[in-house]
């Protein structure tokens, strides 16, 4: 008798995606982050759902409702800090996942890659709106500054900002709509994840060598299920340590002060995972130019496949490209650091140099290096 998992209409979809899926035999731990991101999304939706049961999206009560969750709700503090730090883990896994894609040439699966970029934007939008909800000082001023950037768009900018705000400033209408969208977007993200997986399973996974692995495949279960469980345990250990020992490590102390439109914090900055893009924004003295740099710092991922000039897919056997890749990583870390610093020397010039390097590496140096490597290999 054929196993039910292979015949049942619903189970056979799950079976072909997670059980009998043929996978390359050489996948390293860098291929764990897809499953970790799935777990992060599930954790965020579950904790968020329970938080939403106690949260009120009104400017007069939002801050107090978060305090009420932490003080009076059973394990409310745990839910709140799991949700806040879960977002940080989400972005750590997301950036490592994208870095893996860049290093091993996974971006040549253009459909999967483009859905991934859409996912990145959707998750970033969700995280930004979620940061506004506790209605602390940094929530309010972060929302004001970031939404105000849209006013740089010629002709329609001011109208667009007021339309998003629902008035002439960030107020009750803004908070209510941000809560509505913050609740809705994770489900759109879940749908996009399914499309992402659908496109991935059309082609099969890439592997560290970048060479076709059709002749050497192994079943996903038990080999990669057990490997993913190990990765999951490590991630949950890190998340638990963060939540239970140092829950405010990655947050901003200003957000423990209720929002006050009459008092601007000395240094307005977004959450750490947006700082690299924020540093790109600040490194250009012109408002519209800064906004374009901010958007392009993420949208540049969409043109990476078009700039792939190497005859090899992966960077595994390309030492010059590897050096550039790790330089790019250090530039991104530098931008993240600069984004959290005040706007004064020497931080301004460091940020500008790092921004130029960021775009230079991705747009010019990497394609040129690939051509040089082709020449050295006489290809």
Swiss-Prot record:
It comes from the Eukaryota. It is found in: Mitochondrion inner membrane. It is a multi-pass membrane protein. The chain crosses the membrane at residues 33-53, 77-98, 113-133, 178-198, 226-246, 288-308, 320-340, 347-367. One of its GO terms (molecular function) is metal ion binding. GO terms for biological process: mitochondrial electron transport, ubiquinol to cytochrome c. Heme b b562 binds at residues 83, 182. A ubiquinone binds at residue 201. Heme b b566 binds at residues 97, 196. Keywords: Electron transport, Heme, Iron, Membrane, Metal-binding, Mitochondrion, Mitochondrion inner membrane, Respiratory chain, Transmembrane, Transmembrane helix, Transport, Ubiquinone. Component of the ubiquinol-cytochrome c reductase complex (complex III or cytochrome b-c1 complex) that is part of the mitochondrial respiratory chain. The b-c1 complex mediates electron transfer from ubiquinol to cytochrome c. Contributes to the generation of a proton gradient across the mitochondrial membrane that is then used for ATP synthesis. This is Cytochrome b. It comes from Glyphonycteris daviesi. The gene is MT-CYB.
